[in-house]
From Swiss-Prot:
SMART domains: AAA. Its main location: cytoplasm. It comes from Chlorobium limicola (strain DSM 245 / NBRC 103803 / 6330). It holds the Pfam family RecA. Gene3D superfamilies: P-loop containing nucleotide triphosphate hydrolases (3.40.50.300). Keywords: ATP-binding, Cytoplasm, DNA damage, DNA recombination, DNA repair, DNA-binding, Nucleotide-binding, SOS response. GO terms for molecular function: ATP binding; ATP hydrolysis activity; ATP-dependent DNA damage sensor activity; damaged DNA binding; single-stranded DNA binding. It comes from the Bacteria. It is found in: Cytoplasm. This is Protein RecA. The keyword DNA damage applies. The keyword DNA damage applies. The lineage of its organism: Bacteria, Pseudomonadati, Chlorobiota, Chlorobiia, Chlorobiales. Can catalyze the hydrolysis of ATP in the presence of single-stranded DNA, the ATP-dependent uptake of single-stranded DNA by duplex DNA, and the ATP-dependent hybridization of homologous single-stranded DNAs. It interacts with LexA causing its activation and leading to its autocatalytic cleavage.
Length: 350
């Protein structure tokens, strides 16, 4: 008798044999009708699924998400104020998916996609699928078709606020359209979520913030498109600018904070901070310096940074420059930080 049979017998101890027989018949019938895996015991080896993910392009955010990035087969929402880095973050996810040989698509409902900026962030423009739909229904049908194909790794919808229902487009200016978009999103996500969960795709919805009228207590901010996306999203990321980055008097980027507001695959409410530089995106060097100091790989004494016996320079910018110019040094620091992060992540996630 093999181990699997022994395990099954242990799990079935105490269950009425007649009930067990009826259960097995029901499971067989369901699998015949809907396919293998339609229903399974959570304790079975076949049911234990490792959460695969796609990197966000930020080591700190990947760490905060608990699974090394955005989980595949799930819906993610990235929201925040205007010009906070929502699209930049989504483009980094696309670039990371393409680096792994994946296929990515962007549904540009805002009709504002900038190919030259995406290229600077590492996106392969020639391989990227892009659609600029005329209505919300068309946009969400395109998303569903791409996901059901099973060939796409990342689909980005930019943005929920721009998903205008067909009825609103065909109506007159000033017509009452209360709840139309929320209803559209609710219907679409009911269909989409099942299709996405059976695929290896990450579906990212970029969303904007609006102010709720007449709110006296609590946050007056809310996202567009109703409550369906909040419910169906496995990951919700709140992205904000917290400071400007200056080179002398010139503003060259923003210090950005991302809070994991919702996480169904790991502990939520963690946050990540990193630099987004204009024309470059997430600053990998700046992030590595910050993490190296945090994990004790790089020592900071006053304003001086050092790695072992080697001085990297005075000030954060000098340390970044030293890592950028010495690839072997960069690799050493990166590997040590990565090992410490992975070890810490395993301890935290138990």
């Amino acid at each position: 008798m093999n181990m699997d049979t022994n395990d099954k017998e242990k799990k079935n101890e105490g269950i009425d044999p007649a009930k067990l027989k009826q259960l097995n018949l029901a499971v067989d019938a369901l699998e015949k009708q809907f396919g293998k895996g339609a229903i399974m015991r959570l304790g079975d080896g076949s049911a234990v699924m490792q959460v695969q993910s796609i990197s966000t392009g930020s080591m700190t955010l990947d760490f905060a998400l608990g699974v090394g990035g955005l989980p595949r087969g799930r819906v993610a929402e990235i929201y925040g104020p205007e010009s906070s880095g929502k699209t930049t973050l989504a483009l980094h996810v696309i670039a990371e998916a393409q680096k792994e040989g994946g296929i990515a698509a962007i549904v540009d409902a805002e009709h504002a996609f900038d190919p030259s900026y995406a290229r600077k962030l590492g996106v392969d423009i020639n391989a990227l699928l892009i659609s600029q739909p005329e209505s919300g229904e068309q946009a969400l049908t395109i998303v569903e078709t791409l996901v059901r194909s099973g060939a796409v790794d990342v689909v980005v919808v930019d943005s929920v606020a721009a998903l205008v229902p067909q009825a609103e487009l065909e109506g007159e200016m000033g017509d009452s359209v209360v709840g139309l978009q929320a209803r559209l999103m609710s219907q679409a996500l009911r269909k989409l979520t099942g299709a996405i969960s059976k695929s290896s795709a990450v579906c990212i919805f970029i969303n904007q913030l609006r102010d709720k009228i007449g709110v006296m207590y609590g946050s007056p901010e809310t996202t567009t498109g109703g409550k369906a996306l909040k419910f169906y999203a496995s990951i919700r990321l709140d992205i904000r600018k917290i400071a400007q980055i200056k080179d002398g008097d010139e503003i060259v980027g923003n210090r950005t904070k991302v809070k994991v507001v919702k996480n169904k695959v790991a502990p939520p409410f963690k946050s990540a901070e990193f630099d987004i530089l204009y024309g470059e995106g997430i600053s990998a060097m700046g992030e590595l310096v910050d993490l190296a100091v945090e994990f004790g790989v790089v020592k900071k004494s006053g304003s001086w940074f050092s790695f072992g016996q080697e001085k990297l320079g005075q000030g954060r910018e000098s340390a970044k420059k030293a890592l950028r110019e010495d690839h072997a040094l960069f690799q050493q620091v990166y590997i040590q930080v990565r090992e410490l992060m992975t070890g810490t992540a395993e301890i935290i996630n138990g």
